[in-house]
Every structure is written in structure tokens, then in C-alpha cells.
């Protein structure tokens, strides 16, 4: 039996969002002390091939234990974070008006938001005041991504890891409508 999963991701262009003073404790994405939830600790990369020959070749895509998620994903872009679609992680969410978007791919070089390159300084200085860790919801570009994948039946009972090579600035992931993780600056 093949298991079907719907991956939903939201990428925010901010590191943290400003919380109102006096509110109850901030959710993790508003807390500068929280960089990840349900993620493996950062470390050198490795991959467990099923045999020595494949390991010596070192080509992950040749392994039956590897699945690429590259390709077209359903994509929605909003300029202001608070306008991101609510409930888009639900398996029955209608994304028919969304566009197909190439992954890997930066939304800034695919026609969304502003192209930014900074190796020093504050990358979003044209969008809002430089006041880290506080960031406005306005002009806080947010991309929402959805993809349906089929997981091979022989993966049942195995640990499955999602490796995101790069996400700016943070990422939340759901599988079949259930939250599974959060990461910053992956």
C-alpha cells in the first residue's frame, strides 16, 4: 500500500514577529529563543544507503530510501504576513487558484517580492525598520507551499526525515494537516 501525504509549508521572510506587550507567552515563531521545533539537532549530513555499493557511489537518488521533493509545488504569495491563507494545511483546502512554483526556487527570483542580496547588514531594511527581533506584519512577505506525495509502502515503520536544504527565514511544516515541525534559517 502506498501512503499519500500532503506537505504544506509556510515560509516567512522574517525571523520573528512583534508580540504585544503584556500578552501571554508568545508562540515559538515569535520567540527569538526558539529556533526549531521537532527538528534534528544541526550536524554534518549523512545518509544510510541500503548497501555498500550504493554508499560508495554516494548518489542518494539511486537509493530506494531517498525521495526528492523537487518539482512543482502549489504556491501562494502575500505581501503582508497576516494575509496568508488560513487553514491551508488542511488536506481538503482548495488551492486551485494557486500557481505552480518550482522547488527548489526562491520566490524573489520567480517574480514575487523584492530581490535581495546582502551578505552583511539587515536584508529587509527597505521593508521595515531595523529593530530585531521585532518585525512588522506589513511587508513581511510570506509564501505558502503545498505538495501531495506518495510514500512507498516499504517505508512503513521506518523513520522518515524531511531535509529542507534552505528556507529563508523560517518554515513550518504540516503532513496531512497535522503540524510536524518548525525551523529558522535552515
Residue ranges of model-derived segments:
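Disulfide-rich extracellular domains of secreted proteins
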Residues: 69, 90-93, 180
Amino acid at each position: 500500500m502506498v501512503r499519500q501525504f500532503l506537505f504544506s509549508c509556510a515560509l516567512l521572510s522574517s525571523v520573528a514577529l512583534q508580540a504585544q506587550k503584556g500578552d501571554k507567552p508568545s508562540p515559538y515563531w515569535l520567540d527569538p529563543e526558539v529556533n526549531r521545533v521537532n527538528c534534528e539537532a544541526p550536524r554534518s549530513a549523512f545518509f544510510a544507503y541500503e548497501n555498500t555499493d550504493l554508499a560508495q557511489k554516494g548518489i542518494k537518488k539511486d537509493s530506494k530510501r531517498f525521495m526528492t521533493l523537487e518539482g512543482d509545488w502549489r504556491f501562494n504569495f502575500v505581501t503582508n504576513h497576516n494575509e496568508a491563507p488560513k487553514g491551508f494545511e488542511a488536506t481538503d483546502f482548495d488551492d486551485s487558484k494557486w500557481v505552480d512554483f518550482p522547488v527548489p526556487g526562491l520566490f524573489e527570483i520567480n517574480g514575487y517580492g523584492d530581490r535581495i542580496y546582502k551578505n552583511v547588514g539587515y536584508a529587509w531594511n527597505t521593508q521595515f525598520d531595523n529593530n530585531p527581533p521585532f518585525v512588522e506584519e506589513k511587508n513581511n512577505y510570506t509564501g505558502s507551499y503545498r505538495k501531495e506525495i506518495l510514500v512507498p509502502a516499504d517505508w512503513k515503520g521506518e523513520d522518515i526525515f524531511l531535509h529542507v536544504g534552505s528556507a529563508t527565514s523560517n518554515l513550518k511544516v504540516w503532513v496531512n494537516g497535522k503540524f510536524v515541525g518548525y525551523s529558522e534559517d535552515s
